């Protein structure tokens, strides 16, 4: 698959089937993240790969949090996506004290590389932010002291790729001066 094709075919997939995402494919996805550009070459990311019972544990932490704190119930649809995923990758910012915008932009580039690599491999993916409701619990559970949870990427095979969403025309999103 060519890059432009992967960009056009990338979708936020939230419904996954039971097929396993192989360790080999996960490593390709992480290698793509590793090669992302980063501000000042700081590479401020650490990835925690979760499978099987660990995914159920994250789901249960989300459910427990939502039961205790009504304001977090907006994450309920996300919790279902988490539970259906074959693989979760927690993306931590290893340098939260540095310029947040630089670190978050760098991490965003790494995540986009992951999503495009997953697309190229025929694996569904979705970039999740709502796991922030259990950031403290995740940091403690997976020993990520001093780090900040930036996002979670859910991966899995799918039976049906979601339809593309409408996009603004190029003329509506740019200004060109010469």
Label each PLM-derived region with a short phrase.
Residues 39-42, 81-83, 141-145, 166-168:
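Solvent-exposed alpha-helices and their adjacent loops that cap or buttress functional pockets
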Residues 33, 89, 95-140:
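Small-aliphatic-rich amphipathic alpha-helix that forms the alpha element of a beta-alpha
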Residues 79, 90-91:
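Cyclophilin-type peptidyl-prolyl cis-trans isomerase
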Residues 1-85, 178:
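N-terminal amphipathic, basic helical "cap/leader" segment at the start of enzyme domains
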Residues 64-66, 143-146:
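Short, hinge-like loop/turn segments at secondary-structure boundaries
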